Amino acid sequence: MMFKQYLQVTKPGIIFGNLISVIGGFLLASKGSIDYPLFIYTLVGVSLVVASGCVFNNYIDRDIDRKMERTKNRVLVKGLISPAVSLVYATLLGFAGFMLLWFGANPLACWLGVMGFVVYVGVYSLYMKRHSVYGTLIGSLSGAAPPVIGYCAVTGEFDSGAAILLAIFSLWQMPHSYAIAIFRFKDYQAANIPVLPVVKGISVAKNHITLYIIAFAVATLMLSLGGYAGYKYLVVAAAVSVWWLGMALRGYKVADDRIWARKLFGFSIIAITALSVMMSVDFMVPDSHTLLAAVW
C-alpha cells in the first residue's frame, strides 16, 4: 500500500509522457546507431528527475490542491505521506537522477536537467503558478527539457536540432495547458490560480491557442527543413498540425467550451506522441543537403 502512495506522489502519468519525448529526442539524435547503456541511463535519469520535480510540486501545492476537485485526493493532501518525508524522498530522487545523467550520459544532459528542474520547481511551482498569468509560459520551458536532454545525451552539444526540439515542445505545452485550464476552469478559479482563461477569459485563451498551434506547426516542420528528420515525419507533422489547428478554429463556434477543450487536450496528446514516434524512426534525410538548403 505504501509503495502505491510513493508511486502516486511522483505522478507516473507525467513521467510516462515525458519518457516518450525523451525517447524521441534520443533516437532522433542517434540516427539508427543506438548506445543502449546510454539510452537506459538517460531514460532512468530523466525519470528520476521528473519524479523528484513532481514530488516537490505536490509538496508546494498542498494548499491549493485541497481546493481543486481534480487534486483534493492527492497523497499529501490526504496526509498519507508526511510533508517532511516527501521532501526527503524528492531530494533523494533528484540526486539519483542528476548523478545518472552526469556520469551515465554527459554533463550537458545533467545541466539541462538541472535547468528544467529549477524552472519547474523554483520558478513555476513556487512563484509563477500562483502570481502570474505567464506561469504557463515559464512552465512550458521545463516541460520541453526532457526531449532536449535525450537529444543532447547523444550529441553532447546544444545545436540547432536541440533548439528546434525546445521550440516544438514548448509551443505544444501552451495550447495543451490552456485546454486543461478551460475544461477545469472552476477548479483553477476556486484555487485562485491566475491561468489565462480565468484572468483574461476563454475567448482570449482561444486566440492564444490558435496562435500557439500555428507557431507549433512551423516549429515542427523545421526538423525536416533543417535536415534532422525525413519526409515521413514531415507529412505526419503537417497532418497533425493542420488537424489540431482545425480543432482550435472550431472552438470559436462551439456551444460547450468544456467539451471542446477536452477534445483539444486529447488530440494534443496524440499529436505530440505521433511526432515523438516519427522523429524516432524517420531520422534519415535523402542526402547530406538539408531540405532547407534545397529550397534556397
UniProtKB/Swiss-Prot annotation:
Highest taxon in the source lineage: Bacteria
Cell location: Cell inner membrane
Ranges per topology, Cytoplasmic: 1-9, 57-78, 127-197, 248-268
Pathway where this protein functions: Porphyrin-containing compound metabolism; heme O biosynthesis; heme O from protoheme: step 1/1
Catalysed reactions listed for this entry: heme b + (2E,6E)-farnesyl diphosphate + H2O = Fe(II)-heme o + diphosphate
Enzyme Commission code: 2.5.1.141
Single GO term (MF): protoheme IX farnesyltransferase activity
UniProt GO cellular component terms: plasma membrane
Periplasmic side: 29-37, 98-107, 217-228, 288-296
CDD domains, per database record: PT_UbiA_Cox10
Gene3D superfamilies to which the protein is assigned, alphabetical: UbiA prenyltransferase
Protein's name according to its UniProt entry: Protoheme IX farnesyltransferase
Gene: cyoE
